[in-house]
Amino acid sequence: MSLVHINILMAFTMSLTGLLMYRSHLMSALLCLEGMVLSLFILATLTILNSHFTLANMMPIILLVFAACEAAIGLALLIMISNTYGTDYVQNLNLLQC
């Protein structure tokens, strides 16, 4: 395993740790989730480029499209929640009321 792969896996684990530790605000959780998806995108791209598997060249592009959709939906939910409740604290949200 090369140093680049180790750094990308470390970025993924740091984003996962950030998601688990800083989940009081919705914005910080969304940023950590975006970091996880982007590190997975880079790891998938490097793996496909190193393996020279030509049939899977579309997988990183599909993953990038899903990351963009996830970011757009997350920001729309953040705006809706902050307009409705006046804050972005995750503790104030109740799934039974939403």
From Swiss-Prot:
Keyword hit for rRNA-binding: no
Record keywords, A-Z: Electron transport, Membrane, Mitochondrion, Mitochondrion inner membrane, NAD, Respiratory chain, Translocase, Transmembrane, Transmembrane helix, Transport, Ubiquinone
Main location: mitochondrion
EC number, as in UniProt: 7.1.1.2
GO terms classed as biological process: ATP synthesis coupled electron transport
InterPro entries with a match to the protein in the record: NADH_UbQ_OxRdtase_chain4L/K, NUOK/Mnh_C1-like
Pfam families (UniProt xref): Oxidored_q2
Reactions catalysed, as given in the entry: a ubiquinone + NADH + 5 H(+)(in) = a ubiquinol + NAD(+) + 4 H(+)(out)
Keyword match RNA-binding: no
GO annotation, cellular component aspect: mitochondrial inner membrane; respiratory chain complex I
Domain of life: Eukaryota
Subcellular location: Mitochondrion inner membrane
Transmembrane segments: 1-21, 29-49, 61-81
GO MF terms held by the record: NADH dehydrogenase (ubiquinone) activity
Membrane-related topology note: Multi-pass membrane protein
Family to which the UniProt record says this protein belongs: Belongs to the complex I subunit 4L family.
Described function: Core subunit of the mitochondrial membrane respiratory chain NADH dehydrogenase (Complex I) which catalyzes electron transfer from NADH through the respiratory chain, using ubiquinone as an electron acceptor. Part of the enzyme membrane arm which is embedded in the lipid bilayer and involved in proton translocation.
UniProt subunit comment: Core subunit of respiratory chain NADH dehydrogenase (Complex I) which is composed of 45 different subunits.
Protein name per the record: NADH-ubiquinone oxidoreductase chain 4L
Organism from which the protein derives: Monodon monoceros
Gene encoding the protein: MT-ND4L
